[in-house]
Amino acid sequence: MKELIMLIRPEKLEDIKKILDEINCGGMTLSTVMGCGTQKGVSTEDAAVVNELKGFKTTINLLPKVKVEVVVEDKDVEPIISKVRDECATDHVGDGKIFIKDVEDAIRIRTGERGIKAL
């Protein structure tokens, strides 16, 4: 099993939910987060707008993101990544990131089921 941690633009959330529904993903955890990448959260065209909204200059501007966390079977990882990239890539800075982690086990608290059955 793998955990996919996807940091995406908020407006792409419905697309991600649709992708996960198509593969019958058992569930997901969503969080509203703020962050920045190597561009420190601002592209050249965004800098004036962000600074105007903040009312002061900052050295690092954090942008709103949605963090989507899912645990899936290994076989589903590459199809999900491919579909997420197809739907979420805008060719602009700030499209997000996907992190992949190994999951040793999963346990459904209510029933005690383990592994894939717990998803």
Predicted regions and their residues:
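Positively charged, small/polar-rich N-terminal and surface patches that mediate targeting and assembly
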Residues: 1-119
